[in-house]
Amino acid sequence: MKFVPKSESTRSFIIEATAELFNKKGYAGTSITDLEKATNLTKGSIYGNFENKEQVALAAFDYNLATLRKRFRTAVDAASSYKEKILAYFAIYSNPQLVNTGGCPIQNTGVEADDTHEALRERAAEGLLSFKENLVELINKGILAKEFKADANAEKIALTVIALIEGAILISRTTKDRSSLKTVLGSAREYIEQICIK
């Protein structure tokens, strides 16, 4: 029998109300009681709209990722040069608003789910690969626009930038020291400067 949610508006409300909770506490750390408190709904109301907790978590991850992507698009579209477009990602990740909502959903979900929850791990991997492809595209366009050096390896640069950003977030959140985020993102900026045509 196919599961049919009772109401799209209630379903959307549940997703929005629990997205930050899942991003902060993770799948394993979020109980049905947490979901009830976050939504002010009963277990029956929640599960009348979702088959199980996993389905709520997957929808919450999708919502968190879509929110992050929207921030990226807005910042990238506002930037004029390809260098500025790439640096816009750094600005998003250093924004306290992202920290206050639990941090990077790709990292949070990927770290928790890598050995424990295949469906969430796959979603996080898709998000990470999409992030990489967006950077590769910007770098390649920057090469064509003669903003970046012709021999710049877009794939390598994109992976390095992601590793620096995600590593900076991990260090900063683990040590509760935002200055380390600033330091590592500064190094990432210097790395991007090296591919720019002066």
List where the protein language model places each region.
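Alpha-helical DNA-contacting segments of helix-turn-helix folds
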Residues: F50, L58-N64
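Hydrophobic alpha-helical segments that form the core
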Residues: A152-I171, S187-Y191
